[in-house]
Amino acid sequence: MDRLLVLVRHGQSEWNLQNLFTGWKDPDLTDLGVSEAKAAGRALKTAGVGFDIGFTSDLLRAQRTMKLLLAEFGQPDLQVTKNVSLNERDYGDLSGLNKAEAAQQWGDEQVHLWRRSYDVPPPGGESLKDTVARVLPYYCQEILPAVLNGKRTLVTAHGNSLRALIMVLDKLTPKTIPGMELATGVPIVYRLKADSTVESKQVLEP
C-alpha cells in the first residue's frame, strides 16, 4: 500500500513579496507564485505520483496553489477539502505590517521573539505552539486516516501550519521547529509506515 503524503507551501503571495506579516489576511499569489504552483505540479508529474484526495486551508493563496498545481499535474477534478484548521498562524496585531514597521512599534528584539519563539504569541495572535494545537487534531482526525487507508494525499497550506505537520513527521522539537524555513511551491513527498511514522522523505526542488 502506498501511504503517500505530499506537503506544498503556497506559492509566493503579494504580501510575501512586500515582506508583510500575512497570517489570516487573504492576498492572492504573485505572478511568481503562480509559476511556483505550476512548477510544483510539473515536479510531481515528473516524479510519477498521483493523488486520491487533497486538503487545503480556508485562504485563497493555498487554494489557488492547489488549483494551479492540479491543473498542471493533470488532475483538475481531484476531491479537495478546505478547512480553517490548516490556515496560517494568526499574527494578530502584526498582520498587514512589514517587518520594519513592527520593529519600530515594538522593537527588534520583541518582534524577533514573536516570530521565532515557540510559545510567545504576538498581541491578539497565535504562537507557533497555538498553531500546532490547532493543526494537529485536524491532521490526526482527517488527513492521517486518509493516508493510512492508502489514499494518496496532497496538502497545500502555509509555512507555519505545515511546520506543525513536519514537527510530528520529522520528530522535531519546540527548540528546532521555529527556525525551520519552508520554500514556497516546493513539494515535500513523504511515504509513511503503517504505524504513521516516516518511511521516506523527498524534497522535489524545481
From Swiss-Prot:
Pfam hit, one: His_Phos_1
Similarity annotation: Belongs to the phosphoglycerate mutase family. BPG-dependent PGAM subfamily.
NCBIfam families in the cross-refs: pgm_1 (TIGR01258), PRK01295.1 (NF002339)
Entry's Gene Ontology BP terms: gluconeogenesis; glycolytic process
Record-linked SMART domains: PGAM
Quaternary context: Homodimer.
Identification of the protein by name: 2,3-bisphosphoglycerate-dependent phosphoglycerate mutase
EC number: 5.4.2.11
Active site per database record: H10 (tele-phosphohistidine intermediate), E88 (proton donor/acceptor)
Site-annotated residues for Transition state stabilizer: H158
GO MF annotations in UniProt: phosphoglycerate mutase activity
Keywords attached to this entry: Gluconeogenesis, Glycolysis, Isomerase
Residues bound to substrate: 9-16, 22-23, 61, 88-91, 99, 115-116, 159-160
Xref: HAMAP family: PGAM_GpmA
Pathway stated in the Swiss-Prot or TrEMBL entry: Carbohydrate degradation; glycolysis; pyruvate from D-glyceraldehyde 3-phosphate: step 3/5
Role of this protein: Catalyzes the interconversion of 2-phosphoglycerate and 3-phosphoglycerate.
Swiss-Prot/TrEMBL catalytic activity: (2R)-2-phosphoglycerate = (2R)-3-phosphoglycerate
Signal peptide coordinates: none
Organism: Methylocella silvestris (strain DSM 15510 / CIP 108128 / LMG 27833 / NCIMB 13906 / BL2)
